[in-house]
């Protein structure tokens, strides 16, 4: 719109039509890890501790990227506590056409996969670490993702087996860290950031959730968890600050009802915040080195 208005204002300009196209390419990942078929870029959404709104941020980030025109999927990597089926309002079981792969579920224009689609809601996952990591690999690689620009991975909190598996065996383009301004959350967020750095996964940026609370009755605004913590962390580690989100009861209500904020209130202020975070995430990914591994032929050396 800005480009159209600027050109139309020039003397002698008639009717102006501006067509904008985009091309999203695959970007470099950890050494020795191959790309997943049908997926160009994998972005992990992680947090150092639970309860900071990571899953809500992940699903709204995925939906916001889709709203910007990208082809997006979301993988629920929280094997012990999957929440994406509820947040996306999806029920039922995924299908398998060939008996080897499974078709992703779909909602609001994005593809989705979760262990929650394969078990009953009340069934606990009493699994040890190796079984959990194997399940994650199968969910990722046995799902027939269809030409995704971005696959958002909703990580479990902490720095355990799943995080290690993801960083060693899954081609991650970058990680988004979600935290609150609270000192305890920031301490754990720093640990998560350092873990990704140690295993060679670049940090796309940090999102500060619950940064401010606005009373739904009187409109009073208050920083109940502190202020400025995530921005300070970004400066300390020289990583981008992607944005802040409010502590708003509607975000929780919309996610619980199976209609996350970006689709429940697309013209609202909070939805625009999510879209701005999505745009910054896309820009940060685009600035990373492209992956050219598929463009080169395989070289085989044989002794004859």
Q: Model-predicted segments: where are they?
A:
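Walker A/P-loop phosphate-binding motif and the immediately C-terminal alpha-helix
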Residues: 42-78, 193
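Phosphate-binding loop that captures ATP/GTP phosphates
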Residues: 65-127, 133-141
């Amino acid at each position: 719109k800005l480009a159209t208005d600027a050109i139309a204002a020039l003397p002698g300009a008639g009717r102006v039509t501006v067509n904008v196209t985009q091309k999203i390419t695959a970007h470099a990942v950890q050494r020795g890890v191959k790309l997943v078929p049908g997926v160009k870029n994998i972005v992990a959404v992680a947090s150092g501790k639970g309860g900071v709104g990571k899953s809500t941020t992940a699903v709204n980030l995925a939906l916001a990227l889709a709203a910007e025109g990208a082809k997006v999927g979301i993988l629920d990597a929280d094997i012990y506590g999957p929440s994406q089926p509820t947040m996306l309002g999806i029920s039922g079981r995924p299908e398998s056409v060939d008996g080897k792969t499974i078709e992703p579920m779909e909602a609001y224009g994005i593809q989705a996969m979760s262990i929650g689609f394969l078990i009953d809601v009340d069934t606990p996952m009493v699994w040890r670490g190796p079984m959990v990591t194997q399940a994650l690999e199968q969910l990722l690689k046995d799902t027939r993702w269809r030409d995704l620009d971005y696959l958002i991975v909703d990580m479990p909190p902490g720095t355990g087996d799943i995080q290690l598996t993801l960083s060693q065996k899954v081609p991650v383009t970058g990680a988004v860290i979600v935290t609150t301004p609270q000192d305890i959350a920031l301490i754990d967020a720093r640990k998560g950031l350092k873990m990704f750095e140690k295993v060679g996964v670049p940090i796309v940026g940090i999102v500060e959730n619950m940064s401010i609370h606005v009373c739904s009755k009187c409109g009073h605004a208050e920083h109940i968890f502190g202020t400025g913590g995530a921005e300070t962390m970004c400066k300390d580690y020289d990583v981008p600050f992607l944005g802040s989100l409010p502590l708003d009861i509607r975000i929780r209500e919309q996610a619980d009802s199976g209609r996350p904020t970006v689709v429940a209130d697309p013209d609202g202020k909070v939805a625009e915040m999510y879209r701005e975070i999505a745009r910054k995430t896309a820009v940060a990914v685009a600035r990373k080195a492209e992956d050219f591994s598929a463009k080169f032929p395989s070289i085989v050396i044989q002794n004859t």
